[in-house]
């Protein structure tokens, strides 16, 4: 900061974002517009509604550097979405470090009947007038609640029947080492809950292959779990040790060759699952979002709600 402050034309150096409002007020900026109104030449916009994570999974550095849960005020979110819809955006993606914990930081001292949850926010957004659809970004299995699924079922034209539910491993033993807070059976049960209430929902996920201590048996358990879940897409990540996380110092680290081999095997399974999912949509009518025309053909690139 000291080196930056002496550079030509530098008036202030902000070392803590919490100081920003006070600093700007010294320059006469007292009302700062929040949110984003444009995302370039796109039809999809991203609205961050939450920050921070408390879970402390053994492989993740985020809770160590951003531990404080912060939910964005609802009116700010609604105003931003209205601006985006007015500017022509037709899909609004709600994002957050731990999206499913939206409202948790407000609920500590409130009776349960007054809690604000993600389902509360999604319902309120779905009731905003306009021709747009809502998509949720990454969410944890235990946050796929009956309340949230009920809201998704109530607004099928507004809320995409798609959930990105983080699995990370399909082995209960590896989940325990990862310090995940649920079992594979809980995960599958939440997927089944969604299937029972929504038409042709799709599930995507993240999986880490080659986590320390992952034997061939544990890896095959992951294969079986992803098959049972029926994902339409899997983001596959070979385990990479993050300095400062417990998993970086775990014994039984796997070789790069083993991790790559397991990644390839899982990718093959993903291709099969992806085909199975899209095969069931053949002949179905879906309302899609047109992304762009294909210049060489009389067709367009579009994205389905799922």
Language-model-detected regions and their locations in the chain:
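Proteins enriched for Cys/Gly/acidic motifs involved in redox and nucleic-acid/cofactor modification
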Residues: 1-105, 117, 163, 185-196, ...
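Short, hinge-like loop/turn segments at secondary-structure boundaries
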Residues: 5-9, 30, 110-112, 152-154, ...
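Conserved SAM/AdoMet-binding glycine-rich loop
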Residues: 86-217
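Conserved N-terminal phosphate-binding loop of PLP-dependent enzymes in the Aspartate aminotransferase
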Residues: 130, 148, 231, 246-249, ...
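Hydrophobic, well-ordered secondary-structure elements that form the walls
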Residues: 165, 206, 226, 234, ...
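Contiguous mid-protein beta-loop-alpha structural module that forms a pocket-lining wall or clamp
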Residues: 214, 229-231
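Short, acidic/polar
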Residues: 217-224
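Terminal RNA-binding accessory module
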Residues: 249-306
């Amino acid at each position: 900061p000291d080196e930056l402050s002496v550079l030509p034309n530098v008036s202030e150096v902000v070392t803590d974002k919490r100081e920003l409002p006070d600093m700007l007020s010294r320059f006469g900026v007292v009302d700062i517009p929040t949110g984003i109104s444009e995302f370039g030449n796109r039809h999809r916009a991203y609205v961050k509604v939450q920050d921070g994570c408390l879970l402390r999974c053994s492989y993740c550095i985020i809770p160590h550097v951003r531990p404080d849960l912060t939910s964005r005020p609802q009116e700010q979110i609604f105003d931003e979405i209205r601006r985006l819809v007015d500017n022509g955006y037709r899909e609004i993606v709600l994002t957050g470090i731990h999206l499913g914990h939206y409202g948790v930081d407000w609920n500590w001292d409130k009776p349960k009947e007054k809690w604000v949850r993600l389902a509360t926010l999604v319902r309120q957004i779905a009731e905003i007038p306009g021709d747009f659809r809502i998509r949720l970004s990454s969410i944890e299995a235990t946050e796929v609640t009956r309340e949230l699924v009920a809201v998704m079922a109530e607004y099928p034209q507004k809320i995409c029947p798609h959930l990105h539910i983080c699995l990370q491993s399909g082995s209960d033993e590896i989940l325990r080492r990862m310090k995940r807070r649920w079992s594979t059976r809980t995960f599958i049960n939440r997927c089944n809950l969604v299937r029972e209430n929504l038409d042709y929902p799709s599930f995507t996920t993240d999986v880490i292959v080659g986590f320390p201590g992952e034997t061939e048996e544990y890896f095959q358990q992951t294969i079986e779990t992803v098959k049972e879940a029926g994902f339409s897409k899997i983001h596959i990540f070979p385990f990479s040790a993050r300095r400062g996380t417990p998993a970086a110092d775990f014994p039984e680290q796997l070789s790069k060759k083993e991790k790559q081999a397991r990644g390839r095997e899982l990718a093959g399974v993903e291709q099969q699952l992806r085909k199975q999912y899209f095969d069931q949509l053949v002949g179905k009518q879906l309302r899609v979002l047109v992304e762009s025309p294909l210049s060489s053909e009389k067709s367009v690139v579009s994205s389905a709600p799922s």
